[in-house]
UniProtKB/Swiss-Prot annotation:
This is Biglycan. It comes from the Eukaryota. PROSITE patterns: LRR. LRR repeats lie at residues 82-102, 103-126, 127-150, 151-171, 172-195, 196-220, 221-241, 242-265, 266-289, 290-312, 313-342, 343-368. The lineage of its organism: Eukaryota, Metazoa, Chordata, Craniata, Vertebrata. Pfam families: LRR_8, LRRNT. Residues 1-16 form the signal peptide. Coiled coil: none annotated. Changing residue 288 to N: In a breast cancer sample; somatic mutation. Detected in placenta (at protein level). Found in several connective tissues, especially in articular cartilages.
Length: 368
């Protein structure tokens, strides 16, 4: 195991894509009490790295048996714990309990931890959470409780919460009011749950002002129509979506990135993409599209389009670029069309007149 001081120093800013938890230290502390201000950084870019010198050391001798404690970080991962340990210092800000055998969160498990900023419970066996288990956590901003046995979203989440990762559980329903009062929530990762479209009650996301939402690897057959309209990123990859209809994207006009790869999409209704004027990146790879979706030339800010591994047989000269010069505000820097039955030698060079570099175009490698 790496020494805690070194792990702390390597804590880096997490990527918006793919938002996959690989370990306790693979998540952000941006805007947290330990984050170095941009003004303090000089030389190399360390704006997302935890600065150990900026952390006020704790002088408490409290540290649960078998755990590693340094500054205000308590690391109790991979210990075979059956319950949340006692003797946790009240000034703890990061608590790592991942990779244990915890099955229940009880009422007083986090009593006195009013300064806790991040709680990691990934890869346990949690199936039951007391309705007041999180009540003491008045400053909690990041809750990672993925890869457990939850069948419902925990009740009474702290109003301070900014990021919730609850993917890879057994959740089938998102009831109305479950996110009530979470005005600070910015990001929810809830993929890998057996969620169907009918599992989202009308108004389930009311009051949320999310920027990021991922519901990948679920059982969706269409794009949910009642998600927060504030979204900048929406990832619905690895579902069973078969078509995009005109009204599906109507309320998501603020999207920068839309992920719909690895679905069963055969049809995108004309005009559907016109509701996404700020879109920068579109993932439609590994679907069943027979042609390039219409409307791409009208997306003035679009820079990346993934269309590989579809059934596209033809690429028209105006499929990607507008007809007039100066219309597109941002040129493409990535278009993937490989693994499609397109005779790429027949595609006219002018087709990619609004691409920054021909190396950004990926063609060929079609396998029947």
């Amino acid at each position: 195991m790496w020494p805690l001081w070194r792990l702390v120093s390597l804590l880096a800013l997490s990527q918006a894509l793919p938002f996959e938890q690989r370990g306790f230290w693979d998540f952000t502390l941006d805007d947290g009490p330990f984050m170095m201000n941009d003004e303090e950084a000089s030389g190399a870019d360390t704006s997302g790295v935890l600065d150990p010198d900026s952390v006020t050391p704790t002088y408490s001798a409290m540290c649960p048996f078998g755990c590693h404690c340094h500054l205000r970080v308590v690391q109790c991962s991979d210990l075979g714990l059956k319950s949340v340990p006692k003797e946790i210092s009240p000034d703890t800000t990061l608590l790592d309990l991942q990779n244990n055998d915890i099955s229940e969160l009880r009422k007083d498990d986090f009593k006195g931890l009013q300064h806790l900023y991040a709680l990691v419970l990934v890869n346990n066996k949690i199936s039951k959470i007391h309705e007041k288990a999180f009540s003491p956590l008045r400053k909690l901003q990041k809750l990672y409780i993925s890869k457990n046995h939850l069948v419902e979203i925990p009740p009474n989440l702290p109003s301070s919460l900014v990021e919730l990762r609850i993917h890879d559980n057994r959740i089938r329903k998102v009831p109305k009011g479950v996110f009530s009062g979470l005005r600070n929530m910015n990001c929810i990762e809830m993929g890998g749950n057996p969620l169907e479209n009918s599992g989202f009650e009308p108004g389930a996301f009311d009051g949320l002002k999310l920027n990021y939402l991922r519901i990948s690897e679920a059982k969706l057959t269409g794009i949910p129509k009642d998600l927060p309209e504030t979204l900048n990123e929406l990832h619905l990859d690895h579902n069973k979506i078969q078509a995009i209809e005109l009204e599906d994207l109507l309320r998501y006009s603020k999207l920068y990135r839309l992920g719909l790869g690895h679905n069963q999409i055969r049809m995108i209704e004309n005009g559907s993409l016109s509701f996404l004027p700020t879109l920068r990146e579109l993932h439609l790879d590994n679907n069943k599209l027979a042609r390039v979706p219409s409307g791409l030339p009208d997306l003035k800010l679009l820079q990346v389009v993934y269309l590989h591994s579809n059934n596209i047989t033809k690429v028209g000269v105006n499929d990607f670029c507008p007809m007039g010069f100066g219309v597109k505000r941002a040129y493409y820097n990535g278009i993937s069309l490989f693994n499609n039955p397109v005779p790429y030698w027949e595609v006219q060079p002018a087709t990619f007149r609004c691409v920054t570099d021909r190396l950004a175009i990926q063609f060929g490698n079609y396998k029947k």
